[in-house]
Amino acid sequence: MSGRVYLAYGVTSIRNPTGDPYEMMELRESIGSGRRMGPRIFGTGNSVDGSRIYYAGVPTLGSPTEIPLEIKRAELLEYDLIKTYVRLSDGVQKEVIKSAHSIGIPVTSHELYPAVANGADGVEHVRGTSRRGYSTKVSELNRSYQDVIDLLAVSGMTLTPTIGIYGAYELVAVDDPTIFDDPRVTSFFPEAALGHYIPPELLPASRKLVENMASLPKRVVENGGVIIMGTDTPINPRGLSLISEMQALVDYGGMTPLDVMRASTSIAAEAMGYGAEIGSVKEGMIADLILLDENPLEDIRAVRSLRWVMKGGELLSVKELLH
């Protein structure tokens, strides 16, 4: 994990829904102790999957009798959340959610339904892989119908859109290549501008697909639902993926800069159960701040104007983080 990169983009906390549990512990403890530089980690272990796993190395749960061991590990390693994955059966997912909730751990999923009926707390990605072979959130043209909006809004499930990994990052790169004119890009990943080309003849269709997809988060917010920021890094570069995601949600989805900023700070903290500690500027809160030259409420691109970041009261300049 490149903690210095995240801090240079103003990221002071990370919610990581899947990963090696022991690596997560090492990162969380080393950063928490000050031995390693980086954002605080809200993490978990590998995604919990069915007997025919989607990715290698994840726990396989073929029946409810296998659930207690995985939940016990989650408790002992102090997971902040659990992610149920693509090939976990609906019945086993329901039992995982029930068991996780019994020890106070929230559960997220790739699917909206039946996860919402099973009591899941969140859903990842506007699309997302599924054992059903299709998304339960958007059509093949990336359109979402009102039943999707209603389920998200009424249930209170969080939605982490990650529209960048479905073409929005590339569209931002085409429409606004100045996003790469940044010393953080040239210092940390100078190759970031490569490979993100959309042929002119495909640009209108690509734009329409992204706009269809990006409209979902705005509609969820308008109907009282909960959007939290996420990127599915490292599919796109750390930090850069966040500011491009924020820009895409405003430019292509029509979200207000204020809603995007709140989804990145206070609402995200509340969704993790830490709204009383981080995510807002109030007396008694942990001192996490970013200092910008411009106002992101007027133009979301202003998040690029970061000059200083404060994490837990420690003030760091972007300039020193680059070296």
Task: Outline where the language-model segments fall.
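Divalent-metal coordination cores built from histidine and acidic residues
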Residues: M1-S109, P114-G122, V126, S144-S187
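Divalent metal-coordination and catalytic microenvironments
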Residues: G10, I41, E78, A100, ...
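Acidic/histidine-rich helix-loop elements
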Residues: V48-P64, T129-E140, Y197-S206
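Active-site neighborhoods of metal-dependent hydrolases
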Residues: E70-L88, Y134-G253
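Acidic, glycine-enriched loop/beta-strand segments at the rims
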Residues: P237-L240, M255-M261, A271-L306
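Short aromatic-centered micro-motifs
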Residues: V309
